[in-house]
Every structure is written in C-alpha cells, then in structure tokens.
Amino acid sequence: MADLHAIHDGLVVTAFWEAKPAEVDQVVDILKRFLPQAQREPGVKAFQIHQSLTEPEKFFFYEVFRDEAAFADHQQTDHFKTLIAGQALPKLAKRERTQHRFV
C-alpha cells in the first residue's frame, strides 16, 4: 500500500456495513482474514477497515484503487468472492457503498 500522499488519484470507494447483532464477532473474523489479502492486490493503493467504538456492529471501509478496472478486478478475486460475497454479506443487516474521485 502507498502512503496517503501518493494516492491522490484513482477511484475511492467508501462503504458502511452494519452487521446483524448476533454476527458481529464472525464479521470481524472474516474481515481480519480478508484485509491483508485485499491490501496486497496490485491495483489497490489503500484499503482500510474500521469498526465503530460505540456501535461495534458498524464498520467503515476506505478503499483507493488505481482505477475502475482495478476495482472490478478486486471484486473478482477469490478472497472477495469467498470471504465477502460468500461469508460476510449474508451476516449484514445493512450495506452502503459509494464511489468517489479526488478533487
């Protein structure tokens, strides 16, 4: 991953997740296994996942990809398909995702 001064171009994706209350610990475990793999993808400039201190079922993702193609590639990786699409998403009560560009 590049430092923050080197990432001011590309596609920024933010996501907010809310896990089902009984699934929080499982979601944390899945994300801990997923994150290092996502951070090593060639098109990823930054990838951070945060958990709320006051509402532990809520998660915030900050992702910077080289471009839209890198984001599309990310969603086709085995770790995304298995850990996120296959395991994490069914454990969520809510998911929002937005794409941004640097100004």
Task: Name these PLM-found stretches.
Residues 1-9, 49-55, 84-103:
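Glycine-rich beta-strand-turn "strand-cap" elements at beta-sheet edges
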Residues 3-39:
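N-terminal first-folded block
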Residues 39-45, 64-98:
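An amphipathic, aromatic/His-enriched active-site/gating alpha helix that lines ligand/cofactor pockets
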Residues 12-13, 24-28, 44, 64, ...:
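Extended aliphatic helical segments
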Residues 11-18, 48-75:
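Short, well-ordered beta-strand segments in beta-rich or mixed alpha/beta enzyme
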Residues 36-59, 100:
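Short, glycine- and small/hydrophobic-rich beta-strand elements in well-ordered beta-sheets
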